[in-house]
Amino acid sequence: MRILLSNDDGYFAPGLACLAEALSVIADIVVVAPERDRSGASNSLTLDRPLSLRKSHNGFYYVNGTPTDCVHLAVTGMLDTLPDMVVSGINDGANMGDDTIYSGTVAAATEGFLLGVPSLAISLAGFSAGNFPTAARVAAEIVRRFETDKLHGPVLLNINVPDIPYDELQGLEVTRLGRRHKAEPVVKYKTPRGETVYWVGAAGPAQDAGEGTDFLAIQRKRVSVTPLQIDLTRYGQLDAVKEWLNSHALGSTRS
């Protein structure tokens, strides 16, 4: 089995190193990751300049682009054959609910999915680097399961692992995405030169953390596994929007 690894924290991130160590025992791995932290890059591609691919001293490849760039470059321009799986992570922090829209970790897995490769995004739902081995072990177990018993149809799974030792996990739960409240406002600062600058505010707290959500699974010390899809269509509103638009002919609102 051949696995392409990537992330959004950068090729030097300890979570990526921990994941690579765990998966190298059960598969041939190739690591292609951003040259710097690209958290929050979402599904962006670099289109205004060429990309470079370099190899670091630890054998990992790194790209001067986004997580999506890394997977796209690796699958369409670097590797001779499609990998059997793309695994993105281990992210330093949760990717639950609305986080998935912004997450570079999820985006790297999404790009693999779009290119026809079964893909996993794995995140540690906390900031304790000491528990990266917990998430790495979970990732290895899910990869082994996939190798012996493949899921039918396209696969894009978002996995969040509680920030606790492996022996304290209370199992695994298939979940839906929860929701967060809107993010905190930007934080304004003055530089020593008097320039006003802004930091993006913190993510909002959980709003929908009810039964079946990723938030609740993590609260219960359970691994959250959420199947994702790309289709953003709001099917329940199609008829309402159609009726709304059909009630006004084009040009009827012009003054």
UniProtKB/Swiss-Prot annotation:
Nucleotidase that shows phosphatase activity on nucleoside 5'-monophosphates. Its cofactor is a divalent metal cation. It catalyses: a ribonucleoside 5'-phosphate + H2O = a ribonucleoside + phosphate. It comes from Nitrosospira multiformis (strain ATCC 25196 / NCIMB 11849 / C 71). Belongs to the SurE nucleotidase family. It is found in: Cytoplasm. GO terms for cellular component: cytoplasm. Binds 1 divalent metal cation per subunit. Its main location: cytoplasm. Keywords: Cytoplasm, Hydrolase, Metal-binding, Nucleotide-binding. SUPFAM superfamilies: SurE-like. This is 5'-nucleotidase SurE. GO terms for molecular function: 3'-nucleotidase activity; 5'-nucleotidase activity; exopolyphosphatase activity; metal ion binding; nucleotide binding. HAMAP family: SurE. It holds the Pfam family SurE. Its EC number is 3.1.3.5. InterPro entries: SurE, SurE-like_Pase/nucleotidase, SurE-like_sf. The keyword Hydrolase applies. The keyword Transmembrane does not apply. It comes from the Bacteria. A divalent metal cation binds at residues 8-9, 39, 91.
